[in-house]
Amino acid sequence: GLLANLGHLEALLEGLGHPPGRVQVVAEEDPDALEALLWGPPPPPAAGSGDFLPMGGKRALLRLVADRLHADAPRPAEVVALPEGAPFGRVVVEAAGCTLCHACVGACPTGALEAHPERPMLRFTEDACVQCGLCRNTCPEKVIRLEPRLAFGPAAREAVILKEEEPARCVRCGKAFGTKSSIERIVARLAGAHWMFQDPEAVERLRMCDDCRVVSQ
């Protein structure tokens, strides 16, 4: 609602060095008191007049305004922490627990999280993240958390690698499939412990792609 959005703006201004109370909600029933407030001396502007064209959607306009406030800030900061629920922020992934299943990629509505087309990799673009939480709720390993904040500079608009692993390669044809660590975990769990994987040839099929497993049987 309105109060939540004003809270986000107040946090941004304070993070950029402005004193508290720059954003206020006037709830006054007395018309004379309201008139006195409206005609009173205004506070100094938080930023000079902008020289940008207000083009794009709501999020693009918010970014333009935030960049202008950052340029004229008393104490510019590269990153400003925001309250929970703010529509800007980053996704933090505990890399050790991530299996690169890419469930989060499929759930992300803005494309902030993306997979690499050729390698087991998870990439993230902070500027596209709206902190909806779908990735966190979808993650089967529960290794994703949200960090509401506003980052300035070109780094926020560039994709960063959150997790990358060596791909598993089929021992028969060399085709890449899955991640090497996940395949080896499966081998360690099943080899000798399951009746279907008592002989070395059956275990070796676990290290083959789907096509080669069919051919080798």
What are these regions (language model features)?
Residues 2-121, 127-128, 138, 142-192, ...:
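Ferredoxin-type iron-sulfur electron-transfer modules and their immediate structural context
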